[in-house]
């Protein structure tokens, strides 16, 4: 077994106090996202999306956040993917944003709701053409005999859609994750980290400090 117990560091970038918190957690999330982008972090919109299968086995993968507002967090994916199939059976999910250089993380619990075709199409048309074509190529989560199969399919579809717009695949969609709770974590000295959780009760958010 590889021993990693000596790998540690102190957290000293500042704390998080109750007086710092807005009543709406999305306002704090927007501030932290802006600061993550301003700090030029690598992939600040990357989030871990966790789902479970019919046996309760959890699965995680990194997905890019594409939009957020007071209603929740939006991402897009292949509807034949493992995550989409698991969401169809159980739409309870969690999201995690790891902003390590800022000594921050945000954890979200909520339910995923499928977006309308109009909403998906609006985003799909903003993607680079090669990315649109790639959406047609991959049967996400299916087994491949070799990478060449995937690349061959890509060039085949690229020739097919050489002229004009790339249509939206019927098997490509998106989700809005409506949060029921959002936790903000800020690293603190001596491992006395600051954690605050917002829990939704009807239309209001209740705020509590959690022990680190």
From Swiss-Prot:
The keyword Ligase belongs to this UniProt entry's keyword annotation: no
Enzyme's top EC category: oxidoreductase
UniProt KW Oxidoreductase keyword: yes
Known catalytic reactions: pyridoxamine 5'-phosphate + O2 + H2O = pyridoxal 5'-phosphate + H2O2 + NH4(+); pyridoxine 5'-phosphate + O2 = pyridoxal 5'-phosphate + H2O2
Co-factor binding comment: Binds 1 FMN per subunit.
Binding locations of FMN: 61-66, 76-77, 82-83, 105, 140-141, 185, 195
Pathway recorded for this protein: Cofactor metabolism; pyridoxal 5'-phosphate salvage; pyridoxal 5'-phosphate from pyridoxamine 5'-phosphate: step 1/1; Cofactor metabolism; pyridoxal 5'-phosphate salvage; pyridoxal 5'-phosphate from pyridoxine 5'-phosphate: step 1/1
EC number: 1.4.3.5
InterPro entries: Pyridox_Oxase, Pyridox_Oxase_CS, Pyridox_Oxase_N, Pyridoxamine_oxidase_dimer_C, Split_barrel_FMN-bd
Entries under HAMAP family matching the protein: PdxH
Function: Catalyzes the oxidation of either pyridoxine 5'-phosphate (PNP) or pyridoxamine 5'-phosphate (PMP) into pyridoxal 5'-phosphate (PLP).
Family from the record: Belongs to the pyridoxamine 5'-phosphate oxidase family.
Protein name: Pyridoxine/pyridoxamine 5'-phosphate oxidase
Organism, as annotated: Shewanella baltica (strain OS223)
Gene name tied to this protein: pdxH
């Amino acid at each position: 077994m590889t021993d990693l117990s000596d790998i540690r560091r102190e957290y000293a970038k500042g704390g998080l106090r109750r007086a710092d918190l807005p009543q709406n957690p999305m306002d704090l999330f927007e501030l932290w996202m802006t600061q993550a982008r301003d700090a030029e972090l690598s992939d600040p919109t990357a989030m871990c999306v966790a789902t479970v299968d019919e046996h309760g086995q959890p699965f995680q993968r990194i997905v890019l956040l594409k939009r957020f507002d007071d209603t929740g967090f939006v991402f897009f994916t292949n509807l034949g993917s493992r995550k989409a199939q698991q969401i169809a059976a159980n739409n309870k999910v969690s999201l995690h944003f790891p902003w390590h250089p800022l000594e921050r993380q945000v954890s979200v619990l909520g339910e995923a709701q499928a977006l309308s075709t109009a909403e998906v199409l609006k985003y799909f048309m903003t993607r680079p053409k090669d990315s649109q074509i790639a959406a047609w190529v991959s049967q996400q989560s299916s087994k491949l005999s070799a990478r060449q199969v995937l690349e061959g399919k890509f060039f085949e579809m690229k020739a097919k859609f050489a002229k004009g717009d790339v249509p939206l695949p019927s098997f490509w969609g998106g989700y809005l994750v409506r949060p029921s709770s959002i936790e903000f974590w800020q690293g603190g000295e001596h491992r006395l980290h600051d954690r605050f959780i917002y829990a939704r009760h009807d239309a209001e958010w209740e705020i509590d400090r959690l022990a680190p």
